[in-house]
């Protein structure tokens, strides 16, 4: 029994070195990326966020992730970056990025995945912003009408393909908030 524990004690450094040179680097990169995400979220919560700096930080975050990182994480970062682009009113760039991201998400995760749905919602918002900006700047109807139609199609698709109990959950939340407000 004594030999077994001695052998086990001598093999511990081998296991630690193996982990350090294989999965350890990726884990350290993930921890740094997590801290970077917290920093970016703090920048987003600022009273007047600098969206250009936030977009740059998302680019840096994408670069510092390990190559073997799950596609879901990369898609979430791209979605957050597209949201920042929309806040900066780079509507055309955001629509282009969201369209390619939607294709990738649908192929990788499926049409009903949360990330695919979130991307589709953000794409609908981007088309709505494009419609609004074109209309308020006096563009002809032929220019803004395709964006309005695409917005309608996206949100109709989302409404038709929602979870079966989503509407009831939403109504329950609204009723609970309403009751809380009345009881105060």
Give names to the regions the model predicted.
Residues 52-56, 74-79, 117-120, 141-149, ...:
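Short, charged, amphipathic alpha-helical segments
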Residues 43-46, 91-108, 128-177:
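Short coil/linker segments at helix-helix boundaries
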Residues 21, 28, 69-70, 112, ...:
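Short coil/turn linker motifs that delimit alpha-helical repeat modules in TPR/alpha-solenoid proteins
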Residues 2-78, 83-90, 95, 162, ...:
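N-terminal alpha-helical interaction modules that lie
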